[in-house]
A protein has these predicted regions:
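Conserved beta-strand/short-helix segments
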Residues: 1-172
Length: 172
């Protein structure tokens, strides 16, 4: 994510309570490095130079339910990440779900990033469509599916109703 040539670790903690927000969820990025790691890493020690925390937004969103590398979605040469929050309520649609793409960059990460701060320059939010779709239940990099030179993502919505058929699931 930070372009240092070492793979990073992405961890989801869907039941975390960031800022006292019950089950908003958190995710953690631990930066890879030369020379290895100690036998355990205290995630509360992430300070921006060794990794960072991504805070979920609202109560019961369970952000971090699913996490994945996203490839390089914006084509800037840095790997991006993908975080699912399958029970988020975008636009008042109960449990339609949300997913977040967070852009990688060369250094300068703060120790905590609130997913509500994604503004297009640092990442973006993908809102589920309909009530109870559970969009973001599964997330994954897809590679460059359409051949435009940018990596694409797959977002699973396990209870979506494609073509009006209940609970058939859909991946937009």
């Amino acid at each position: 994510m930070n372009g240092d040539g070492f793979d990073d670790i992405l961890i989801g903690a869907r039941d975390a309570d960031p800022n006292g927000i019950y089950n908003a969820g958190e995710s953690y990025v631990v930066f890879g490095k030369a020379g290895g790691f100690s036998s355990s890493i205290d995630l509360s020690s992430l300070d921006g130079s060794n990794g960072f925390v991504l805070n979920g937004i609202d109560e019961f969103d369970i952000s971090g339910f699913s996490v994945s590398s996203a490839g390089d979605v914006n084509g800037d040469g840095f790997d991006d990440i993908l975080i699912g929050a399958s029970t988020a309520d975008p636009n008042g649609n109960r449990e339609a779900g949300e997913s977040y793409v967070v852009f990688g960059k060369a250094g300068g990460f703060s120790s905590i990033i609130d997913l509500s701060s994604l503004d297009g320059s640092n990442g973006f939010i993908l809102n589920g469509i309909d009530r109870y779709d559970d969009s973001g239940y599964s997330v994954s990099s897809a590679g460059d599916v359409n051949g435009d030179g940018f990596d694409d993502v797959i977002i699973g919505a396990r209870f979506a109703d494609p073509a009006g058929e209940s609970y058939k699931g859909i991946t937009p």
